[in-house]
């Protein structure tokens, strides 16, 4: 519960213990470039995907969870494939900022669950517990400077456009109930122009560019090693004050001591 994490943080603060901010990693790239697959591969190589959600040191967030609620008129367009889901205005940036700030403060947060078939938010939430590393993926993660500046590492998944289109066609037909003609029209009308205008220009902000997505194990292994340094040896260095400006160690509950390191 959110109240539990807030009480825990308050108790630690009153006892003079500093709380380290989580390490936020932004993962951007075009539609169906493999952003989710890269994040999942990182989780797998770290062994975090087999750990209970309450105990994970690394968690994944998706910008897709933060699509705005559509008006009846917008929803009617969406059903026909005539609504631009790749425009910055399609996302609830205010909620993204609030969520990121809460995560930075070590709070438990509740993430909306979006239904791509009905184009609406479900009446349920995903609970995200405090973690040491947060991977936040989405097509426009680096578009807003306010959001972009919160990431301590920025990754851009760079995949061939033809590969991305073929993946999107297969995904939208099999998972989202779309017709082929609708998927192609939407890609030509909205997706491709939006990528070129809003997503591709943000590639310059990336610290690491990952060609071929999850197939690029060399790049992913380097990123995994960096995250392992944060989870393992990094803690020892930060115990002494971590004077380089990245914060101090997040204090763990007794129940957290069993987490693998």
From Swiss-Prot:
Pathway assigned in UniProt: Pyrimidine metabolism; CTP biosynthesis via salvage pathway; CTP from cytidine: step 1/3; Pyrimidine metabolism; UMP biosynthesis via salvage pathway; UMP from uridine: step 1/1
Gene Ontology biological process terms, A to Z: CTP salvage; UMP salvage
Membrane-crossing segments per the record: none
One Gene Ontology term of the molecular function aspect: ATP binding
Keywords: ATP-binding, Kinase, Nucleotide-binding, Transferase
Binding residues for ATP: 29-37, 215
UniProt-listed InterPro entries: P-loop_NTPase, PRK/URK, Uridine_kinase-like
Binding site for substrate: 86, 114, 119, 168, 178, 186
GO CC entries: cytoplasm
Chain positions covered by the region annotation Disordered: 238-261
Annotated EC: 2.7.1.48
Catalytic activity: uridine + ATP = UMP + ADP + H(+); cytidine + ATP = CMP + ADP + H(+)
Role this protein plays: Phosphorylates uridine and cytidine to uridine monophosphate and cytidine monophosphate. Does not phosphorylate deoxyribonucleosides or purine ribonucleosides. Can use ATP or GTP as a phosphate donor.
Subunit structure: Homotetramer.
Family classification: Belongs to the uridine kinase family.
Name assigned to this protein: Uridine-cytidine kinase 2-B
């Amino acid at each position: 519960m959110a109240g539990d994490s807030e009480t825990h943080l308050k108790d630690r603060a009153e006892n003079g213990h500093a709380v380290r901010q989580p390490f936020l990693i932004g993962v951007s790239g075009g539609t169906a470039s493999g952003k989710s697959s890269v994040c999942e591969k990182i989780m797998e190589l770290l062994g975090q995907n087999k750990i209970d959600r309450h105990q994970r040191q690394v968690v994944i967030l998706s910008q897709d969870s933060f699509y705005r609620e559509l008006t009846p008129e917008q929803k009617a367009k969406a059903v026909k494939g005539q609504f631009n889901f790749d425009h910055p205005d399609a996302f609830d940036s205010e909620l993204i900022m609030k969520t990121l700030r809460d995560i930075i403060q070590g709070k438990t947060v509740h993430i909306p669950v979006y239904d791509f078939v009905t184009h609406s938010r479900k009446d349920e939430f995903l609970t995200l517990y405090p973690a040491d590393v947060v991977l936040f993926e989405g097509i426009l993660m680096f578009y807003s400077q306010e959001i972009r500046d919160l990431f301590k590492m920025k990754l851009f998944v760079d995949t061939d456009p033809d590969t991305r289109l073929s993946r999107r066609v297969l995904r939208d037909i099999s998972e989202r109930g779309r017709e082929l003609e609708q998927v192609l029209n939407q890609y030509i009308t909205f997706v491709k122009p939006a990528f070129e205008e809003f997503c591709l220009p943000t590639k310059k902000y990336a610290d690491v560019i990952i060609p071929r997505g999850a197939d690029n194990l060399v790049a992913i292994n380097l990123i995994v090693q960096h995250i392992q340094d944060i989870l393992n040896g990094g803690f020892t260095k930060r115990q002494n004050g971590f004077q380089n400006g990245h914060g101090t160690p997040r204090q763990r509950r007794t129940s957290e001591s069993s987490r693998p390191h």
